[in-house]
Structure formats: C-alpha cells, structure tokens
C-alpha cells in the first residue's frame, strides 16, 4: 500500500501530528511535532499551547528524535523485517492452534485484532480466563461495544512471547469449551 501524506493533498484547514515514539520505540522521550502550514491557524494553536503551558521538548528529547529520523533507517528496516516475521508467525499460529478464531489482516501496525466470538464468550470472560492462564491481552470492548468477543494482540515483542501467548490462549479457550461441554460455568 502506498502512503499519501495529508499535507501533500492540501495546505488549507489541515495539520499533521507526528512522533518517532511508535516507530522507533521512543515513547519515553515524550516528543512530538505538529505541522501546521496555514500561518493563521498556526498562530492560534501556538497561542492556545502557550496558554496551556505546553512548551517545546527538552534537549535530550529533541536530539533523540532527530537522531532516530537521521540515523535510524537500518534499525527500522531490521525492525520491520522482524515484525513482518512476527505477523506471519502469529497468522500461522492462529490458523493452526485456534481454527475458530479470525485474525484481521494487519496493515501498518504491530497490533493484531483477534475475533474469538465463535468461542461464545464476552470480553470479561475471555480476560478472566486468559489471566488465569498467565497471559494478558487488550480486551476488544476497550475500543467500544463493537469489540465484544475480540482481543488485541501485540506482536512488538520477542517471537517466543507470541508463541507462548497463543499457547496459553489456546489452553484457556480449550478449558472453556471443555467446561461448557460438561455444563460447568
């Protein structure tokens, strides 16, 4: 898929917010940028930011962000290859271990969206069962009512953690299916 920056389409009534935090794992720097081409809009935003006490980032954060953008290409290429391997690994594991589950294809993210509605549990039960088996996901309802029966899976981790997490999820789901088959709640 081709990325089209919004600022390449128009300079009017638009702004762009960006940060190196997700891409380069620099959230601790608490540094972001706002690109506002329209001078009048930029002036209004600057006035409100000053009123709110928002200042530019500290020198360490500015330099860390600059270094990531200027020198981080090789590291980022390696990360992207690793995450692509994790995505493929998760896809294969879900297909093999959780045949009733549906993994939404991941595009431009390291977060998988796993549909477990076929197992007949709501998010509260899913979370209780997965925690009992020592694995935690983000429950789908965190993102709204439409997320009921879904879990979010983070693949930005060592591959062995994905394997372990899916195996524990399988144990939790198998246990639930077994209990329901025997009339145990």
Model-derived features: where do they sit?
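PLP-dependent class I/II
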Residues: 1-185
């Amino acid at each position: 898929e081709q990325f089209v920056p919004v600022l390449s389409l128009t300079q009017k009534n638009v702004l762009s917010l960006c940060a190196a935090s997700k891409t380069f794992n620099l959230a601790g720097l608490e540094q972001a940028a706002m690109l506002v081409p329209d001078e009048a809009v930029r002036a209004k935003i600057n006035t409100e930011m000053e009123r709110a006490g928002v200042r530019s980032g500290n020198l360490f954060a500015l330099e860390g962000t600059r270094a990531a953008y200027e020198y981080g290409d090789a590291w980022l290429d390696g990360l992207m290859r690793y995450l692509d391997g994790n995505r493929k690994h998760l896809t294969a594991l879900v297909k093999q271990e959780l045949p009733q589950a549906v993994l939404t294809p991941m595009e431009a993210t390291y977060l998988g969206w796993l549909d477990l509605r076929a197992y007949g549990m709501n998010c509260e039960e899913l979370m209780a069962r997965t925690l009992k088996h020592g694995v935690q996901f983000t429950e789908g309802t965190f993102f709204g009512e439409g997320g009921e029966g879904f879990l979010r899976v983070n693949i930005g981790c060592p591959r062995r953690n994905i394997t372990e997490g899916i195996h524990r999820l399988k144990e939790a789901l198998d246990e639930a299916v077994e209990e329901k088959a025997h009339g145990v709640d």
